[in-house]
C-alpha cells in the first residue's frame, strides 16, 4: 500500500467527532418536533396531553424505545413518573409537570427520593419545555444538586443541544460524560474556588509575588485576611 492508498483511508473518528455527530442528530430530531411543541403550547394542554408530548420527545428526539421508558414506578412507598432504562439499566428518574407549569427545586424531592433508594444518580424535573437535571447524592443525607437547566422553547443552540444529547439514550449510556460535566461544575463553584485561593500553596505564591513586586514582606495570614476582607466580601 503506497501513500496514495494510505491517504484514501478514512480518518478514524474521535470521541469528539462521534459526540458532534450525535449533537447534530439531536438538533435535526428536535427541529422535526418543534412545530408540534409550539402548537400544543398554544392550546393550554392538561397533564395527560403534556405526558403524551414528553413521550414523543423521549422516543423521537432522545432515542429511547418504549420498553426503556418505564412509567408510574413505585419502590418502598416512593414513586416516580418515569424511569429511563437504556438497555434495561435504570439510569434517570423523571418528575413530569404540565407544559409551562412553573418549576421549583422542591418539586424534585419525590424523584430524588426514589432515585436515592433505587441507586440512581440522576433525576430530571421537566414541564416539557424546561428541563432541570439534578445529581442525587446520598453520602450523609439525600441531596439534589442542580447540574444544568435547559429551555427548549426557543430552539437549540450548540450548548443546549449538547446537554440534551447527554440526556439521550446514547448520551446517558456514556455515564462518564455527565460525571465530567458535574465535576467541572463542582470545580468551578464558589466554594471550590475560594478553597483553592486560600490554599497554603497559593498563599505562598501570592506572598512571593507581593514581596517581589511590592517589596513588602507579608505573612500568609495577613494575605488571607486581606483576601477575605477585600476580595471575597
Which residues does each PLM region occupy?
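Short beta-alpha junction loops
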Residues: 128-130
Amino acid at each position: 500500500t503506497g501513500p496514495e492508498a494510505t491517504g484514501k483511508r478514512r480518518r478514524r473518528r474521535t470521541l469528539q467527532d462521534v459526540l458532534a455527530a450525535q449533537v447534530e442528530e439531536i438538533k435535526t430530531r428536535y427541529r422535526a418536533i418543534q412545530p408540534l411543541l409550539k402548537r400544543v403550547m398554544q392550546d393550554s394542554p392538561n397533564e395527560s396531553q403534556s405526558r403524551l408530548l414528553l413521550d414523543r420527545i423521549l422516543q423521537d428526539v432522545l432515542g429511547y424505545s418504549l420498553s426503556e421508558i418505564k412509567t408510574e414506578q413505585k419502590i418502598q412507598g416512593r414513586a416516580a413518573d418515569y424511569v429511563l432504562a437504556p438497555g434495561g439499566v435504570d439510569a434517570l428518574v423523571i418528575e413530569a409537570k404540565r407544559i409551562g407549569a412553573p418549576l421549583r427545586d422542591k418539586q424534585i424531592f419525590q424523584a430524588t427520593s426514589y432515585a436515592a433508594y433505587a441507586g440512581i444518580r440522576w433525576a430530571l424535573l421537566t414541564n416539557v419545555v424546561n428541563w432541570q437535571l439534578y445529581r442525587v447524592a446520598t453520602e450523609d443525607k439525600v441531596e439534589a444538586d442542580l447540574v444544568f437547566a435547559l429551555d427548549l422553547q426557543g430552539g437549540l443552540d450548540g450548548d443546549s443541544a449538547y446537554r440534551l444529547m447527554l440526556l439521550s439514550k446514547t448520551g446517558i449510556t456514556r455515564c462518564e460524560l455527565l460525571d465530567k460535566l458535574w465535576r467541572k461544575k463542582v470545580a468551578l463553584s464558589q466554594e471550590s474556588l475560594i478553597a483553592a485561593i486560600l490554599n497554603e500553596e497559593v498563599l505562598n505564591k501570592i506572598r512571593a509575588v507581593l514581596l517581589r513586586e511590592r517589596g513588602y514582606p507579608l505573612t500568609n495570614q495577613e494575605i488571607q485576611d486581606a483576601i477575605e476582607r477585600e476580595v471575597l466580601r
